[in-house]
Structures are given as structure tokens and as C-alpha cells.
Amino acid sequence: MIDDGIIAAIASGYVESAIGIIRVSGKNSIELLKKIFYPKKNTFEPYKIYHGFLKDSNQKIVDEVLVSVFKSPHSYTGEDSFEINCHGGLLIMQNVLDLVLKNGARLALPGEFTKRAFLNDKIDLLQANAIVNLIKAKTQKALDIAFGQLLKKNTTIIEELREKIIFLMAENEVLIDHPEEDLSDVDLNKRLLILNEITKLIQKLLKFSEKGKYFFEGVNVAIIGKPNVGKSSLLNELTGHNRAIVTDIPGTTTDIVSETLNLNGIPIKILDTAGIRKHSNKIEYLGIKKSHEAIDEADIIIAVFDSSRILDKNDEDILNIIKNKKNVLIVLNKSDLKRKLLLPLNIDPIEISCTKKTGINTLKSRLYNMLIEDYNESEVVSLNTSQIIALKSALKHAKKIKKAYIDSLDPALISIDLQQLADYIEQIIGKIENEDILDNVFKNFCVGK
């Protein structure tokens, strides 16, 4: 059952500003407004802004305000609602909120306005995620992707998934209702083909949700190498800031130095690590220990080598560290000097010179391509943890159904798994009956959203 009681919150954030916004929504919220707001005329037409004064029960003026009125179902929540634009002082905003609460509203929970929008069919869960990402976005590309998801421009894969599952369910019902009909090899092959397509679509959706995660949560990139190969210089060149100290003395960097780079819309946190070698003192040991921790946590590793020196034991240690890592870029610095370094034939290095500032754009391009691969902006979606779990469960069920068809199991049994598969896909959009799951989805929203 949907709670349609009146809720209220400071939507503009509890910070001092020129204007504060108090959002109010729920059944009879307009009646509440009439108790506390005194405009020139006391009849409220929706989608208009009214000037007037807020007064308490003693007719004391609380603030001079502008009020926007919205009528159900044409509001953010789908309910009658209004927003008060007051002066943005902390005390004034709190006084206005207290006035609303004293007259029948309760304080909204985090994300409760958006939860009501979802429950009233104003948005689906993909759009709810998009609203969070609009707020979190740190780059223009992230904003573009979030707006695309909010406007349902990038839900093609999900709609295609639903259509294919519905087709299989309909075909299976025919077999249940008419058991005398034999399942021909042609029909079986058609079903298996569709299941293969469903599997590929789910895998594609999981992949593109991972790409979406990069744009909103960012990527950790660790620069590693032995001392004095130019790791700090590379950090400075990549970010365009002299963030790290650069000297000719090996082992200058003893702690992790980080800086953020906006790489074509992807926020990248670049970590300059301490040079990895056999440590000479406790401080260097701690720095190297942190370097190994950064390597384990990194999404991508940039391993830097000095091309002007022959391969030594410390370089070999670096190669051993990265040999089983998935996303690694090998960089040969000091390419302006005579090359003496020889690497294994299976390595495709990127040659740069931090001194001459060459090769940096090539490195950035390789880094970006490693992240996005065959990324298509129109297909990238942002999913929360629950939705990703549902997708992975759907993938398992699709494979289970395929085996059931091959083994000629009873269509009635297959029907159960098809329904479960459909339910998992519906969870991505938002067909969720469990209130606890819904609360978990919306608890990460800010208060007033």
C-alpha cells in the first residue's frame, strides 16, 4: 500500500545560500498550504508561482516566499505537491520546515519523493538511477548518459530482452495447452537461437553497465615501476599539474600521490606509487607496501620502464607483478635517449618522453580505448547492485532453460523458469513487490529527492 501522507524536506540542501527550497508532497498537501501561506488570492491554480507570506498560528511572519503548486498526477511524485522558495539562511529554512511539519507533514526519508514517483508510475528504476547519476555526475559525458537514461533513450536492449522472453513464454504456453503438438527440430532450433540471443543481450547489458560505472564512479589507475623511471613525471604530464615532486634521486616518492584526470568524460584517479625495489629502510618499505595495495585495487595498471637502461632485477620483478593482471599498459619512458631496454616479444609498449612531452596523447588514447572498447553511448546504462545481481541471475536461468529445451523437459517445468527469467528482467525496470528491496534502492538518495 502506498503511503500518501504529507512529507516534507529541505530539497536545496542544508547549506546557507541565496534561496532555499522546501519540498512538500502528499494527499491534502494543498490544504496544509492554505493554513500557513497568505498570498494576495487564496485559490491555487496548478503550475503557477504565488508570492506571499508564511505565518504561524499566531500570525507571526515566518518568511516572505514564492510558492509553486503542482496537482496530481502531473507532479514529480504524482501527488498533490508544492515547493516553497524561501530565503536561504539556515535558520529561515529550518523555521519554514518546522512550520510545515507542525501543520501535518512529517520529515521525508532519503529518496522518499523519488520512491513515490516510482510507486505512482512516474518513473521506472532505470530512471531513478539516472536521477541519482545526474546529481553525482562529474563530467559532461556522464551528464549526457544520465539524461539519456532519464529520457529512456538507452533502454533498447532491455525492451528487446522483454520481447524475446515474452515470445518464448507464449510459445511455451501453446505447448502446455496443446500437448499433442510435437516440438519439431525447427521449432527447437528457433527457441535455442532466441535463448542464445537473450544470453548475448544480458551479457551485453552487464558489460555496458560496467562501462556506465566508469563514467559515474570513476576509474583507479596505478602508475608503477622501479625508482627513478619517471612515474611522478608521467603523473604530472597526464594531469597537466606539477602534483608530484620530481628529482633525480631514486625513491623520492615514498607515499601514494593521487590526482584526477577527466579523460573524455571518464573521471580517472591516477595514483603515483612508490618505486618498487628491495627496500633500504622502514619508510621505503611502507611506501612499497602501499604500492602493492594500490596495484591490487587498481582498475588499470600503467607499468613504466626506463628505455635508456638495460633490463635489471627490479624491472623483472615489475614484469612478474603484472604478468597475471588483465588491464595493463606498458610504457617506455625516456624515448628521447638511446634505447637499451629489451622486453619480451609479446609486449606492445607505448614509447613516451616526459622530458620532451611526446607520446602522452598516445598513452591517453590507449588508456581510453582499453576502458571503453566497443562502447556505444546510446546503450550504456547505469545499474545498481540489486539490478546487476538480478541480471546475473537471469543469465543463469537463460542457460538453465536452454538445457531444459535440449533435454526435452516438460513445458510446465520450463514455464516456471521462463517466468523467473521474466521476473529478473522486470526487476531491472522496477516490478518489485518486496518493500525491503525498494527501501534499499532509494535509501542512497539524498533527503528532499
Question: Where on the chain are the PLM-derived regions?
Answer:
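Switch I (G2) and immediately adjacent beta-strands of P-loop GTPase domains
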Residues: 51-71, 251-279, 297-300
